[in-house]
Amino acid sequence: MFDAARAAFLGAAVFISVLLVASFFSPTQGRAVEPAPAGAPAQQGSLPNDALGSIEPIHDVDLGGAGQQSPLPAPVDPDPTFNPQPPFVPGELREGFVDVGNGNLRRYLIHVGTNYRPHAPELTPVVFGFGGWKDTPEKFAEYSRFELTDFGANAIIIYPEGIARAWEGAPYAATRMGDDVHFVRTILNAVDADYRIDRGRVYAVGMSNGGGMAASLACHAPDLVAGVVSVSAAYYEPVVADCAPGAVATLDIHGTHDEVIAYQGGMRHGAPFLGAEQVVAGVAARNGCGPALPPRWIEGPAEHYGFAGCAAPVEHIRVLGQKHVWNGVPHATTLAWEFLHRQHK
């Protein structure tokens, strides 16, 4: 057995020696590596020049083009189009309208971040803010105060207006399921025509019925949003039923003493709504999460829950003793920014 193994080893050694001799006398041996042009931009997916070592360059084969090399493709800009004179000035809350079909106009408010430079803009996230039932967009903008935070500096904030000041899925809604999702898509496409927005960083935040609308986007349009935050949310069953496949980062904030939309779920306006923990568990399953992590205490007092191994993060903040409000401690707007600005598709 050992003699056979030794003979095989000697045969392999002879073969390797032949290969080494052949490579030493190869006509390509010793060819200098051509240096890259100074200041040449790195291509997407390429290695840095100093990582290439002595790898020889590969030249294009001449197929009749007199030795011309094909130009390298330029990096792809996810949103190369923008208007250097856009309709809405940065730092101002303005009114806009979009046609959602058949000449039907719907209204929204928009605040373009103060750091947005129309002539040389960077890719900018977009945040949709949805108020509760009967809230005007002006009212939600007033109490959420997004413009006074990093949202107002670094994002485009859009406050859509609900028909009859309500959002799809609720028993009092004037729209059918899908109508308000279509409205949001239409606004986004219209804004994208003039601004350099990052489609991988589109978010939604909402209060009460608006929190349900944010969850509806995560459920029914996971391709559209990278993250959502719902505060004191009304999760009527159509909002979170028959979800499309796709993981969306989700933060739910709800008070244990909510007297309007009970924390544990219930009935309202003749229709059932789901409890906060039930909805969070469903999102965790949809996002492929593992077990819940031990909660940690934060200012409030509140318990902050998370999950392990999610395709997109799922978090829940259970605010002890809080009623049906846009919470100030911990501050919902600050929590929303801290959670959302890390999310990206």
Model-predicted segments: where are they?
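A domain-start/cap signature at the N-terminus of enzymes
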Residues: 2-9, 19-126, 205-229, 235, ...
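Active-site nucleophile loop of the alpha/beta-hydrolase fold
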Residues: 162, 229-237, 255-258
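C-terminal catalytic histidine-bearing segment of alpha/beta-hydrolase fold enzymes
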Residues: 249-253, 273, 284-345
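Acidic beta-to-alpha connecting loop that harbors the catalytic carboxylate
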Residues: 162, 256-259, 264-267, 320-323
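Serine-hydrolase catalytic machinery in alpha/beta-hydrolase-like enzymes
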Residues: 98, 104-117, 121-203, 212-216, ...
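Alpha-helical scaffolding within the catalytic cores
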Residues: 140-147, 234-242, 298-305
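The conserved beta1-alpha1 loop
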Residues: 125-132, 232, 254-255, 320
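Conserved alpha/beta-hydrolase "acid-adjacent" motif
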Residues: 259-264, 271-275, 327-329
